[in-house]
């Protein structure tokens, strides 16, 4: 096996955090590869040695020990499954690979990145790196590697390098790497041009934009065997504020509210040392004054997408809890129909089409509806699902029903 250098940050089409999963043929399920752990997985454009055409590589590296867990070259005959909103797996050269994502938004972004790479392979496109990184084509600009990675703190911009790597294995383009611990000096750690300067007459409270890992309660029923591995430690990117000389002092008192004490210095005596404790201005900043500006966007805790507070209304978030939708499913006994379809018409991966789907391209379309007819006799409430669902869709279009985005924090 030839040892390959990891892809550069600028060569990635998409990059997310996920847990690399491997197929267990004995049990028919998926297990975390090499003991699990959160990894940084991305789709990068590479140039094989001695070939004028570019290939695309799925590269996964565990965060805690920098161990390469996944290296998979994409091919045109790749088969991709979206088993759940946070678990996707694919098949290439009779090898199966899987990823458990932290959020549905990360999963959708990775899916779009893979489809973009497959389209380029099919069309034989020689699109440059700047065209591939078009955020308008792929969306979810928070996970695409068009700028410095979120774990770094750099203000430098580098030109996308053209690299040369060894050709893939002749027996197949996909493999799980069992290399030992790889030391990558400088990888994802860029030098900082300037240190944190001491502010003058300005107080800023930086928001920690690290993604908070949350599990949708409705997804927990589907995730068995790998949902616990989505939990990941959150590392703060900012230094401890107690170690930095700041102009803000928090008064220690028994009051439940924080008093922000700003030292008042006389402009006429800047060169004279003076006890600042004798002249202090006690102010209480307005609540949520900076969170509700016109046109400000926030991240939803349910779907992890960015949304505008001014345009947020009912029906905007499909992942948000909705009491009306839950009531319709309970009244129409759709849980009973889903249970029967899962046991009778699911594939080897446990996937099945929605009970009332009208997609005629499904090979089991007629069989599914023939099964629903006797089920509606046993549970007559199922006959009410379609008219109730139609009324619900009208309510969503009018803004009367549906879930709303909720800002994180």
From Swiss-Prot:
Set out the biological process GO terms recorded for this chain's protein. Answer: regulation of signal transduction
InterPro entries attached to this UniProt entry: KBD, PH-like_dom_sf, SPRE_EVH1, Sprouty, WH1/EVH1_dom
Any one Gene Ontology cellular component term annotated for this protein: plasma membrane
Which residues fall in a compositionally biased region of kind Low complexity?
Answer: 146-155
Q: Where is this region: Disordered?
A: 121-170
| Positions with biased composition (Polar residues) | 123-133
- Tell whether NAD is among the UniProt keywords: no
Which residues are in the KBD domain?
A: 199-253
**This protein's UniProt keywords:** Cell membrane, Cytoplasm, Cytoplasmic vesicle, Membrane
Q: How does it sit in the membrane?
A: Peripheral membrane protein
Q: Which SMART domains match?
A: WH1
WH1 domain ranges (all copies): 5-121
Q: What is its main location?
A: membrane
Q: Which residues form the SPR domain?
A: 299-407
Q: Where in the cell is it found?
A: Cell membrane; Cytoplasmic vesicle, Secretory vesicle membrane; Cytoplasm
Physiological role:
Negatively regulates Ras signaling pathways and downstream activation of MAP kinases.
> How is this protein named in the record?
Sprouty-related, EVH1 domain-containing protein 2
Q: Name the source organism.
A: Xenopus tropicalis
């Amino acid at each position: 096996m030839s040892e390959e250098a990891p892809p550069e940050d600028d060569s990635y089409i998409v990059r997310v955090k996920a847990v690399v999963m491997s197929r267990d043929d004995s049990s028919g399920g998926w297990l975390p590869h090499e003991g699990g752990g959160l990894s940084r997985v991305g789709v990068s454009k590479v140039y094989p040695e001695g070939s004028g055409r570019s290939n695309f590589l799925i590269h996964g590296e565990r965060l805690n020990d920098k161990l390469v867990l996944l290296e998979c070259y994409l091919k045109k005959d790749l088969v991709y499954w979206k088993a759940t909103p946070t678990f996707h797996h694919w098949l290439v050269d009779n090898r199966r690979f899987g990823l458990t994502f932290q959020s549905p938004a990360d999963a959708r972004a990775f899916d779009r990145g893979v489809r973009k790479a497959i389209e380029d392979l099919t069309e034989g496109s020689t699109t440059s790196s700047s065209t591939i990184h078009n955020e308008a084509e792929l969306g979810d600009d928070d996970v695409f590697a068009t700028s410095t990675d979120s774990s770094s703190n750099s203000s430098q911009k580098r030109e996308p390098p053209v690299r040369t790597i060894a050709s893939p294995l002749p027996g197949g383009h996909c493999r799980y790497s069992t290399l030992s611990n790889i030391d990558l000096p400088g990888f994802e750690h860029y030098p900082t041009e300037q240190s944190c300067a001491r502010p003058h007459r300005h107080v800023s409270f930086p928001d920690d934009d690290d993604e908070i890992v949350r599990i949708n309660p409705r997804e927990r029923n589907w995730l068995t065997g790998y949902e616990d591995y989505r939990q990941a430690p959150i590392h703060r990117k900012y230094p401890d504020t107690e170690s930095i000389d700041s102009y803000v002092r928090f008064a220690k008192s028994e009051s439940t509210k924080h008093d922000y004490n700003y030292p008042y210095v006389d402009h006429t005596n800047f060169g004279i040392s003076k006890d600042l404790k004798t002249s202090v201005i006690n102010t209480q900043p307005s609540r949520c004054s900076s969170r509700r500006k016109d046109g400000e966007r926030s991240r939803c805790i349910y779907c992890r997408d960015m949304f505008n507070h001014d345009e947020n209304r009912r029906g905007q978030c499909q992942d948000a809890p909705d009491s009306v939708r839950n009531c319709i499913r309970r009244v129409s006994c759709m849980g009973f129909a889903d249970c029967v379809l899962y046991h009778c018409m699911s594939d080897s991966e446990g996937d099945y089409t929605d009970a009332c789907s009208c997609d005629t391209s499904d090979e089991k379309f007629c069989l599914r509806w023939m099964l629903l007819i006797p089920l509606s006799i046993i549970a007559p409430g199922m006959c009410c699902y379609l008219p109730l669902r139609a009324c619900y869709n009208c309510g969503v279009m009018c803004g009367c029903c549906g879930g709303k985005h909720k800002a994180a924090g």
